[in-house]
Swiss-Prot record:
It catalyses: [protein]-peptidylproline (omega=180) = [protein]-peptidylproline (omega=0). The lineage of its organism: Bacteria, Pseudomonadati, Pseudomonadota, Gammaproteobacteria, Enterobacterales. The gene is slyD. It comes from Yersinia pestis. Residues 76-120 are annotated as: IF-chaperone. Transmembrane segments: none annotated. The keyword Oxidoreductase does not apply. This is FKBP-type peptidyl-prolyl cis-trans isomerase SlyD.
């Protein structure tokens, strides 16, 4: 069965930056499952998978414009510390989900000042070309529920209410934050299966 829209694909992969640094991987023993054609992966990787089948293994270079986009200086902001109420100690490198008019946006603290914090809303791989080694582990039909929800439900998945955020995130009032539970990877917002 060839990878096409509305099929569930299980893939193992490694992704490296141009200088060879491994930034994420999912081994054959724990492949990433996603619903093809629903924007769960960065465009360049999803496009490269189209037409492949179980057992195929290949390398693909994904340019920044088909990955996490260009680095945008406008996504770096200086905000008052009190925006992070309830967080005892703010440190460089901490990640949060900021609630915005466009929905939750992952941000990373890049500087901590006396009264302010500098946050960067760019994905940590923004502006970088990426090299993937991919193995298609399996391809199957999606269930009706998976098609309705637009993502894969595995044996360890849980049912959710519509409106819940991805990776356990949920909405807050404007400018509130919560810790992000994902990490960088081939998904559109940092976690491999989340967007």
């Amino acid at each position: 069965m060839k990878v096409t829209k509305d099929l569930v694909v299980s893939l193992a992969y490694q992704v490296r930056t141009e200088d060879g640094v491994l930034v994420d991987e999912s081994p054959v023993s724990a492949p990433l499952d996603y619903l093809h054609g629903h924007g769960s992966l960065i465009a360049g990787l999803e496009n490269a998978l189209e037409g492949h089948e179980a057992g195929d293994s290949f390398d693909v270079r994904v340019n920044a414009d088909e990955g996490y986009g260009s680095y945008d200086e406008n996504l770096v902001q200086r905000v008052p510390k009190d925006v992070f109420m309830g967080v005892d100690e703010l440190e460089v490198g901490m990640r949060f989900l900021a609630d915005t008019d466009q929905g939750p946006v992952p941000v990373e603290i890049t500087a901590v000042e006396d009264e302010h914090v500098v946050v960067d809303g760019n994905h940590m791989l923004a502006g970088q070309d990426l090299n993937f080694h991919v193995e298609v582990v399996a391809v199957r039909e999606a269930t009706e529920e998976e098609l309705q929800h637009g993502h894969v439900h595995g044996e360890h998945d849980h049912h959710h209410e519509h409106g819940d955020g991805c990776c356990g995130g949920h909405g807050h009032d404007d400018h509130e934050h919560e810790h992000e539970h994902g990490k960088g990877g081939c998904g559109k917002s940092g976690g491999c299966g989340c967007h």
